[in-house]
Regions:
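Core nucleotide-handling region used for phosphoryl-transfer chemistry
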Residues: 1-175
């Protein structure tokens, strides 16, 4: 989600058109109008964009979700290079803290900021977490690792991968 010429710009899967963009936009527009405006002003003031995970009952998904939800993953500057880096971690943390303050003023369960579940300090801790997650079969899509430089890597779990493979095998003859 970004702002261009004072208008919110919705994008999904690297495009501003299509079903997923419409789902995202429609969900976002169910938020209180004043909250939408505060988010827009936050983005404009800081020249940044928000990254979301959009959960919609209208989008068939391998993992069953009981309700629609907008998970804020990150807020990033609208530039390709930030002081020699691609991601400014302190900028992101500060903007997310601002957003958190805004969200606390509203009684909505539709939008929230993704929380850190566990922080690791050694390679052994990281290896143990990855092995544990990749060998579990709980009903989740997976997990996201964020390093100290703000780079994110998404791991799909075995439950998700198994059912995605099965779904694709079943649907292949019909495509």
């Amino acid at each position: 989600l970004g702002v261009i010429n004072d208008e919110l710009v919705f994008a999904s899967k690297s495009t501003t058109e299509g079903m997923h963009v419409d789902l995202f936009k429609n969900l976002f527009q169910t938020l209180p109008t004043s909250l939408q405006e505060e988010i827009k002003e936050l983005l404009k003031r800081n020249c940044c964009s928000m990254m979301f995970e959009v959960i919609s009952q209208e989008d068939t998904h391998i993992i069953k979700y009981d309700q629609d939800h907008l998970y804020v993953l990150d807020m990033i500057q609208n530039t390709l290079d930030v002081n020699g880096k691609h991601i400014d971690v302190s900028f992101s943390r500060e903007r997310l803290a601002e957003l958190d303050s805004i969200l606390k003023k509203y009684d909505t369960q539709l939008i929230s900021i993704v929380k850190t579940i566990q922080q690791v300090n050694t390679m052994d801790e990281l290896t143990n977490i990855i092995n544990k997650e990749l060998n579990s079969h709980h009903e989740s899509e997976g997990f996201v690792l964020v390093d100290s430089n703000g780079f994110m890597t998404k791991f799909k779990g075995p439950y998700y991968n198994t059912w995605r493979y099965r779904r694709n095998r079943i649907l292949r003859p019909y495509q």
